Every structure is written in C-alpha cells, then in structure tokens.
Amino acid sequence: MEETYGYPYFLIHRGDLHKVLLDRAYEVGTDIKVNSYVSDVDETGPSVTLTNGLKFTADLVIGADGIISQASPLARNTNRFLIGIKSRIRKSVILDRDVKIIPDPNCAYRTLIPGELMANDPDLKALIDNPAANCWIGPEGHIMAYPIRNGALYNFVMCHPGSVPVGQPNERASLDDLIERYKSWDSIICKLISLVPQCLKWQNAEIEKLETWISKSGKVVLIGDASHAMVPYMAQGAAMAVEDAVAIAECLGRVTDTEQIPELMSHFQKIRLQRCYLILDGARNNGNIWHLPDGLAQQQRDKKMAQQTKPQEAESSQGNPNKWSDPKFQPWMFGHDARAEAKSYLYNVYPTTEAAKKFNADITVNTSALIV
C-alpha cells in the first residue's frame, strides 16, 4: 500500500482518530461546544439555535451530524436516538420532505477483544503480532478484523443479516448465536468469539442520494454521513468525510468576501458529489458480492478472485469482483488526492488572486463549531 500510494493503511480506533482531530481543532483555536442540542436552524442567516436558548450566527453552517442526529430535545429527554431524517440541519437543506433512510439487510456486530487474551493461542497471537486487516467472506456475511492501539485491542466486526432500529445504540448481541452462526467457518473465528467480552449490534444503513447538499441560501452545507451515509463494505465512510473537509477548506480558501460563499459551496458540491455516490454504490455492490450464497455465482466470484493472486492470470482477467482489490477501482479509490482535485477544479473556475491571498491573511470565515 505504501509503495503504491505513498502512505500506509492505518489501523486505528475511531475514538483515537476523533481525538487527533479534536486536539488539532483546539490547536488552531476552534471554539467547540459539546452537549449542544440544536432546536432550530435558520438557513437565511445563517444561525443555529440550541435547546438552551443560545443562538449562534455564522457566515456558513456546516452540518456534519451524520446519519443519526441528537439534534432534538426528544433525543436527549427520552434517550432515544433520532435517525438523520429528523436532523435539524439537514431539514434546513431539504425543506419539503423527509429524506429516506435505507436500512441494509445486515447488521454490524462490533466488539473489541483485549490483545492479552489472544497471546496464549499461537493462531490468535499471529493476528496481533502481524498487523494487517483480515477479511473472511461467506454465505450472507463477512468479518473484518484488525489490531489497534499497538496490539492492545483487536477490532472484530461481523456483518450478517439482522435488524435493529436505525441509530439505536448499545443493543447487545447473543454470543451463543454468533458462535452458532459461524461454527462452520474458519475455526479461528469461533476462537475469537469465545474471547469476546460483549458484542454490540448496529444496523447498517444508507440515505437516499440527495440532489443537493446545500440550502437554498447557499449558507448551510452538509458533509460526511449527513449527505452521503453509506454501508461499510468499502470502509470508506470516514474517508469520504475527511475528503469532504479537505475540499471544503480549499473552497473557503478562495473567499475574499462572504457573499462568495454560496457560489463556492456550489463548487464544493460539484467537486465531491459524484465521487461520493460512486463510492456509495461501490460499497453496496461489494457487500452483495461478498455475501453471495453458495452456488454458481459464488464459485465464479472465487475463481476470479483467485486469478488476481496470480500475475499472469490477473493480466488476462476482467478485473476483481472484490472492488477493494480491483486493479482499476482500487487506484481510483485509494490513489485519490482530494486537495489536488479541489485545487485543479478551482483553478479553472475560481482562481486564487493576490487580493484573495492578502484578504485571507486578515480574515477568517466564521463557521459554526458545534458538536451535537
């Protein structure tokens, strides 16, 4: 990976990634207000009003509250998570209807196994000692697993049919049911499940493709899962949000007057929308391919995937059914430079002038900085 794309494939706890981003936000002076529940968004201002009555005005509101939203007092008072179609911020962009949320047939069964529990079994110890993402695929399911925190924990995620209300957290899965489900798979899997302290069940889902991520005023914009939530079968959901952030930063870097923000948000959407929705489709399709039941289609899939491990046969094959490893799709996905793409696009339609450089040295666009 590093030889091909210039960077390694990092295996990281999502909470640790959040901490890295949070620390950097504080370093550059961001004012972050946690436990802030949004009661109203005025997209014309724009402004955001919290349930405690505080109101914040800004030049731009960036909605990054994901497929789930705690932006309503109902979410706080009843301890029930509201799905993203109830998001106050998204409702300021899509005014006339609720956005459809599309549950996947599968749930993700997530757990973290202490690395020390795996150390006494040679088969399991090898998974910790040799950092790599391991994937098992089979009938109506797959498993993705890898070590994190220098082997202190082993992230273990099983995906197979199940149902739970979208956005409901902390529903526990039966470990006995998991062992029964995977007893005919690789014996290592049941060994791992036997070490699981607890397993939480999460409904995989995506939202419908939106025609716009921008409010009518151009002063509220959606990024990340709020605009393109996808199923996890390409492991690209967080990556797309980071790419969004890079692209929107490049757009805001061209601002010489706040009146330009709506136009630049339109350019941001043009830069990002097609790629995000191609990844969204690719993730769904990859899940369908991984989860094929035993039969002819599965046998053909396995044959084509095996060909990709043999250089001579790979050259004559028509690609890998596993898009993660496909010789055409993988470079397009992993080799993408979001900053370079944004700069190239903006250079042609919105070049940075000397005046803009001087202006940007003296002014910062006021964006909302709320974690909801």
Per-region residue spans from a language model:
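Active-site acidic short loop of glycosyltransferases
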Residues: 43, 57-58, 194, 198, ...
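Conserved N-terminal helical subregion
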Residues: 1-115, 165-178, 326-328, 333-372
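Conserved mid-domain beta->alpha element of the FAD-binding
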Residues: 62-63, 80-81, 109, 145, ...
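Short beta-strand or tight-loop elements
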Residues: 34, 44, 139-141, 200, ...
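Conserved FAD/dinucleotide-binding core of flavoprotein oxidoreductases
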Residues: 1-9, 13-14, 52-54, 98-102, ...
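Short, flexible helix/strand-to-coil boundary loops that buttress conserved ligand/catalytic motifs
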Residues: 75-76, 92-93, 193, 234, ...
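C-terminal helical "tail/cap" subdomain of flavin- and related membrane-associated enzymes
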Residues: 250-372
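Amphipathic alpha-helical interaction motifs in eukaryotic regulatory proteins
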Residues: 22, 26, 39, 72, ...
